Amino acid sequence: MSWQTYVDNHLLCEIEGDHLSSAAILGQDGGVWAQSSHFPQFKPEEITAIMNDFAEPGSLAPTGLYLGGTKYMVIQGEPGAIIPGKKGPGGVTIEKTNQALIIGIYDKPMTPGQCNMIVERLGDYLIDTGL
C-alpha cells in the first residue's frame, strides 16, 4: 500500500459525516511521504520546532505551534507522543511514530477528539509495525 493510500483512505476517512480538512505523513526530517491536496506548504523550521517539542515536551507552549505559517495554540497532549493544537473552530493533531509524523488538520464541525482518534489510529498502527 502506498503512503498516499494511507492519507486518502485512513486519514481523510469519514467519521460521523465529517472528515479532516487536510492531512499528511512526513518523515521526521520533514520530507513529505504523502499529503492531501490542501495540506499547507510548511517551512523546515516548523518541522524542526515540532520535533523539538517531542524531545522536550512543552517547548512549543510559549510560542505556539506553526504549520504552513498558521499559528496554533498548543493544548495538553501526550508528552513526547501527541501534540494537539487549536485555532478558532479548528485545529491540528500531530503524532510521532518511530520514523514519521502523522498530521491531521480539521475544521468545524469535526471535533478535536475525532481528529485525535483518526491520527492516533493510523499512528499507533504504524508504531506497532515498527514504522
UniProtKB/Swiss-Prot annotation:
Parts forming coiled coils: none
Main localization (coarse): cytoplasm
GO cellular component: cell cortex; cytoskeleton
MF GO annotations: actin monomer binding
Database matches in Gene3D superfamilies: Dynein light chain 2a, cytoplasmic
Keywords: Actin-binding, Allergen, Cytoplasm, Cytoskeleton
CDD domains: PROF
Xref: InterPro entries: PFN, PFN_euk, PFN_sf, Profilin_CS
Recorded superkingdom: Eukaryota
Places the protein is found: Cytoplasm, Cytoskeleton
Subunit structure: Occurs in many kinds of cells as a complex with monomeric actin in a 1:1 ratio.
Family from the record: Belongs to the profilin family.
Function: Binds to actin and affects the structure of the cytoskeleton. At high concentrations, profilin prevents the polymerization of actin, whereas it enhances it at low concentrations. By binding to PIP2, it inhibits the formation of IP3 and DG.
The name this protein goes by in its record: Profilin
Provenance organism: Arachis hypogaea
